[in-house]
Every structure is written in C-alpha cells, then in structure tokens.
Amino acid sequence: SLFPNPTSYISYSTPFSPLLNNKILFATKVGYNCPERVVTLQGDKPEEVIVNLNEEQLKSIELPEHEPFEFTGGYGDQVYGWIIKPINFDEKEKYPVALLIHGGPESSWTSGWSYSWNPQIWAQQGYVVVLINPHGSTGVNSAFLNAVRNDWGGVPYEDIITGINYVASNYAYVNKNKMCALGGSYGGYMVNWI
C-alpha cells in the first residue's frame, strides 16, 4: 500500500510537469472540506497555495466534520471508510444515515471534493453519511483491488453490509431505523444487491 492507512491522506493530482530542474511540482489538492486548489510541492518544504478560487466563498459556509473508520471485512482484511457528520452535530442526538456507494467498482472514496457525489450535500441535510471502500476499491493493494473480479456482488457486498452494521453498532448517534443506500453506476448495482 502506498499509504499505511488509506484514510489518512489528502488527494493530489499532478497534470503538470516538474519545473526548475525537477525540484518543484505543481499539483491540484482537494479534501472533503476544500474544493480544488493549485499548490506547489518542493521536497520537505510546506506546500505553497498558488490558486484558491473558492477561499472567499468557503469562509461563509460551515462544512461538516469528517472522520475515518476501519473494520474487519471479507477475507479478514481491514476495510476503510469515512463518516461525515451533519452540521451542528450533537452526539446525544440520533441521525438518519445515507450510505453512499462509489462507482467503478475500481474506484474509491478519498478525502476529496466532488461536484457530483458530494457527501457534504447529504450531511448539510442532516444525515450522517457513511462512505465505505469495499474490496475492489483502489488505494489498498492489488489483491484487495482484484478481489472484485468475477465477483461484483460477493465480497464487496459483504464489506458494505459488515461496514454499515459496524457503524450502526459503534456510533451511538446513528439511527438504525432510518438508513438509505445510494449510488451511481457500480454503486447503483450494489444498492440493488442490498
């Protein structure tokens, strides 16, 4: 695995070539609480933000908290996911759950901003959003990724059900009686299995 914990990183994309004798790299950086911005990366130095077009707009918007979680899924493997909490979250309250299932299946939820399947939108409406990266997701290792081959509804389904049960059992603020599952493409396929 490139990262020891697939929920601990921010997403970078590097559509640009390195500059100045291969010592500076331009990249776009995204996270759950920030849309894309252009940064430079230079060795051990802190990144420098070059372009942040959304900075002013985001100052007036409260964005939900997010946290990673992990559980033991199919084949005894660790499976990773995210919980996005509603605005004005109160741990003493019970919240409905929106389980978002990513497409692909060879894709993954990362700490990234999305303009189409943005979990922040559901959290803004009062849902606890659960994002699980079942077998077949990218970012862990090739065996984890390839486990979905010829078995789209097998171990990934097991991971999703085990994961949502884990969340329901370990997070007191989750309303077990008010849950829905959503997804597009492969995510829609998995919703039909559920």
Question: Language model features by range: what are they?
Answer:
Residues S13-I194:
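Serine-hydrolase catalytic core recognition
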Residues L2-N5:
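A short beta-strand motif characteristic of beta-propeller blades
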Residues S8-I10:
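Amphipathic hydrophobic-ligand
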